[in-house]
Regions:
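Alpha-helical membrane-spanning segments of integral membrane proteins, especially the hydrophobic core
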Residues: 81, 85, 112-125, 154-162, ...
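Interfacial segments of multi-pass membrane proteins
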Residues: 103-109, 268-284
Length: 318
């Protein structure tokens, strides 16, 4: 009940801010004119960018499973990714994603699939934190402090430090990962997970670098997708400013526990807050964030649910 209640509260708060904005009529007119002028090409591009980012995610999943000689078609990997999205839609911080990813693996390999999902999450968090660390240098924290309170700058410095520390911790993890898995494999109280640690040891540095590279590419695709949607709605904002705002928003979504179906509330609040230093068209920013959520979160979850119910794929054998 907490999640829906929070969503209602945030929605009311945002509605109040937008409805009382003196620029509401002007922003709405700007959006309507730009949609009419730009047509449907840019929304189509943003849809293709959604498919591209999940294609990249499917390549990552195929790559990491290949480390333990699990070979599959790209299309099968993509279906597993979408299935994971359908489960993650109703779980905190998308923790249910592993269920969809491993549901088609043999029973004795589900533990390995779960461990690989966690590893993939670590890769994603490390990239989001790295991007946030860069974004903090581009972000206009002074303007945000003037809009909120004088202590905002101090909080931004703390969050920047947190992003740097998490990034540094992830780098250390990737450097020592093999020794860490050997330690876990030899730990007496973790003996029953020996096969999982042994599988994780097969993730070499080449695989890690490829996964990091693909995750960086996927994140840049997301940033570009936001910029395309904002341009379609007539929001006058540069790509660098979009990069800063989106990177910080993704970082916020990582560190704050939430559920996908109420995540839209946080996206609204983050977008309204972070982009307010770059543009006055906050209605366009809010609509853009909603469109991206529908494309990147809701639509993949629906596709995944469809495949799970109507088009089940065969179990994958090594």
């Amino acid at each position: 009940m907490v999640g829906p209640a929070l969503l209602i509260l945030i929605s009311y708060h945002l509605y109040h801010k937008l409805s009382t904005s003196p620029q509401l009529s002007f922003d709405l007119n700007t959006i309507q004119q730009n949609i009419s002028k730009n047509g449907m090409l840019l929304p189509l591009v943003s849809l293709l960018l959604m498919l591209l980012q999940w294609t990249i995610e499917a390549l990552k999943w195929r790559k990491i499973l290949g480390a333990v000689s699990f070979h599959m078609k790209w299309a099968t990997s993509l279906k597993m990714i979408f299935a994971g999205q359908s489960f993650s839609f109703i779980t905190p911080n998308r923790m249910g994603e592993f269920i969809g990813r491993v549901v088609y693996l043999p029973s004795e390999k589900k533990g390995i699939g779960t461990a690989f999902t966690v590893y993939n999450t670590v890769v994603q968090i490390s990239v989001y934190c790295f991007f946030a660390s860069i974004a903090f240098y581009f972000y206009d924290a002074t303007s945000l402090s003037k809009k909120l309170s004088s202590s905002t700058g101090e909080w931004i410095e703390i969050l920047q430090l947190v992003a740097l520390l998490i990034s540094f911790a992830c780098i250390i993890f990737f450097v020592i990962q093999k020794r860490l898995f050997i330690f876990l494999m030899n730990a007496h109280f973790l003996k029953k997970f020996t096969n999982i640690w042994s599988a994780c040891m097969q993730i070499n540095h080449e695989t890690s670098i490829v996964m990091l590279g693909l995750t960086i590419l996927k994140t840049l695709v997301i940033v570009f997708q936001y910029w395309v949607v904002f341009s379609w709605l007539g929001v006058d904002i540069s790509f660098i400013s979009t990069f800063a705002g989106v990177s910080l928003m993704l970082f916020g979504l990582v560190v704050i526990p939430t559920i996908s179906f109420v995540e839209i509330g946080l996206r609204w609040e983050f977008s309204y807050l972070l982009f307010s230093v770059y543009t006055s068209n906050l209605l366009g920013i809010t609509i853009g964030a909603t469109i991206i959520w529908l494309l990147n979160v809701v639509l993949p979850a629906i596709i995944g649910a469809f495949w799970l119910i109507f088009k089940p794929i065969d179990r994958i054998d090594p």
